[in-house]
Amino acid sequence: LLVYDNLLLNDKNEMNKDSSYDKKTNALDNYKNDSTIDMEKK
């Protein structure tokens, strides 16, 4: 997840002025939440 977090930070920096920034952030947050749940199940 460290690599993913770094990619997420880079995306946020690039998307700050983009109108779809919030939508993409929500999708990434949902992805991270799903990954965390999957890890807890295992």
Curated annotation (Swiss-Prot):
This is L-lactate dehydrogenase. GO terms for molecular function: L-lactate dehydrogenase activity. The keyword NAD applies. Its EC number is 1.1.1.27. It is an enzyme of class 1 (oxidoreductase). Pathway: Fermentation; pyruvate fermentation to lactate; (S)-lactate from pyruvate: step 1/1. Residues 15-26 have a biased composition (Basic and acidic residues). Residues 15-42 are annotated as: Disordered. Disulfide bonds: none annotated.
